Regions:
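Surface positions of alpha-helical coiled-coils, especially the charged/polar e/g heptad sites
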Residues: 23, 30, 37, 89, ...
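Periplasmic alpha-helical coiled-coil/stalk elements that build and connect Gram-negative outer-membrane
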Residues: 117-230, 317-320, 324
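Bacterial Sec-pathway N-terminal export signals of envelope proteins
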Residues: 19-62, 87, 95, 161-165, ...
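Charged, solvent-exposed structural "stalk/scaffold" segments
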Residues: 23, 134-183, 197, 326-378, ...
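A small-residue-enriched
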Residues: 29-89, 226-290, 294-300, 311-314, ...
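Sec/SRP-type N-terminal targeting helices
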Residues: 39-43, 56, 88-118, 165, ...
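Long amphipathic alpha-helical coiled-coil segments
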Residues: 194-203, 241-244, 248, 302-305, ...
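Bacterial Sec-dependent N-terminal signal peptides
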Residues: 1-26, 32, 391
Length: 391
């Protein structure tokens, strides 16, 4: 378990350091220890272990006692006593034991899958929190610039250098940005509540404003990890379970055995000894073997379908990840050669560009900054979805 947690943390948060890594590590540990859904899943796993062992033992023995009064009394009284144990055919217990082990293994896989989804959700909330922190910082800077521009334009109005239209434009821009800022604050609060819920009610403070570096992907290695992952194992073990249930159905159709001790006493005469019996398999388990064989065929088809769908989905997600990375690279390259908002504001204040040009250009620049942050967020969320197989 400890080794798995270390792998989770390394793969999930691998390329960040310092306080950011500590915050991420704290969140994941809290989720593993305090998350309510995981607590329920652990208890469900224990219940499944106990359920898997039910019905794997022989039936209870039967004890008989009879006291019969004789008539006429000269015959004396008759006392009968017997102990009988019925057993299924021996191979049935072998197959029941195998079925039990497979069910326990599947219960563990189901817990691991639940843990995967919970840790993935925690990872995605962490990424979203960083994204919202970045948006808050970006909007704060943008608001400061808009406030400066509005003040500058109002001074120009007093000096008669601009008209009311320019003042209205500057005020409209400021009001629009204030609305966006309030929306981001609301989203931050919603995300904070979601983080508290997923960490079992514990307050989690995430102030990160830097995304972790993307983890390099090796498609063949990732595909193999999915083929050996919990979902794939669950399907393969489902097939194994149906095969063992088929073998068990065959064993249950074989004769049942009965052995016991019996005694009969009348006056001074007593008979004691053992008795054996065997059932005649006729109609009690009719069609159960045919049904079990049909279920095996169904499970084989389900494994084949899942394997194909899983490979296709992984390849599609890898392609989507590659597309997002290209978008990020293009925008980052474009921003490297673009004028910053502070330079635009300086140019406007010095009369190098008009107020309308500043509004259009700065808004275009700002919207693309937001788009870049969204691309980076989507990239990391897609990456987290792909890497959940290692959780």
């Amino acid at each position: 378990m400890k080794t798995r947690i270390i792998i989770v943390l390394c793969l999930t948060f691998g390329m960040i350091a310092g306080a950011e890594a500590q915050q991420a590590d704290t969140l994941m540990k809290l989720v593993l220890e305090q998350n309510r859904e995981l607590k329920v899943a652990r208890e469900a796993y224990q219940v499944s272990i106990l359920e898997a062992g039910i019905g794997n033992t022989p039936a209870d023995p039967e004890v008989e006692f009879a006291y019969l009064y004789g008539k006429p009394s000269d015959l004396g009284n008759r006392i009968d006593f017997g102990v009988t144990q019925q057993l299924d055919f021996p191979t049935a217990y072998i197959h029941r034991s195998k079925v039990k082990n497979i069910k326990i293994s599947r219960a563990e896989l189901e817990y691991l899958l639940t843990r995967q989804e919970v840790l993935l959700a925690a990872r995605q909330l962490w990424i979203e929190q960083i994204h919202l922190n970045q948006l808050q910082t970006l909007l704060s800077e943008r608001l400061q610039q808009a406030e400066t521009i509005r003040t500058h334009v109002e001074h120009q109005l007093e000096a008669g250098e601009v008209g009311l239209l320019e003042v209205s434009q500057s005020r409209l821009m400021l009001a629009s940005l204030e609305g966006e800022y309030e929306e981001v604050l609301a989203l931050l609060e919603n995300n904070r509540m979601a983080l508290i819920e997923i960490s079992g009610g514990t307050q989690v403070e995430i102030k990160d404003t830097r995304f972790p570096q993307p983890v390099p992907m090796i498609p063949d290695t990732l595909l193999e990890a999915y083929r050996q992952g919990p979902y794939a194992q669950l399907y393969h073990q489902g097939l194994q379970l149906k095969e063992e249930e088929k073998n068990l159905a065959v064993s249950n159709h074989l004769p049942k055995l009965m052995a016991g001790y019996f005694s009969e006493s009348v006056l001074d005469v007593a008979f004691r000894g053992f008795r054996l019996g065997v059932s005649v398999p006729l109609w009690e388990n009719a069609n159960t073997v045919k049904r079990a064989k049909s279920e095996v065929a169904y499970a084989e088809a389900a494994v084949d379908r899942y394997t194909y769908q899983q490979d296709r989905e992984v390849r599609q997600n890898l392609k989507k990840l590659e597309t997002l990375q290209l978008r990020v690279n293009k925008l980052e390259k474009a921003f490297g050669s673009a004028n910053s908002l502070s330079l635009l504001a300086f140019a406007m204040e010095n009369g190098e560009i008009s107020l309308s040009e500043y509004f259009y250009t700065s808004d275009f620049y700002f919207r693309n900054q937001q788009q870049l942050l969204r691309y980076k967020r989507d990239l990391l969320i897609q990456e987290a979805e792909l890497l959940k197989v290692y959780l």
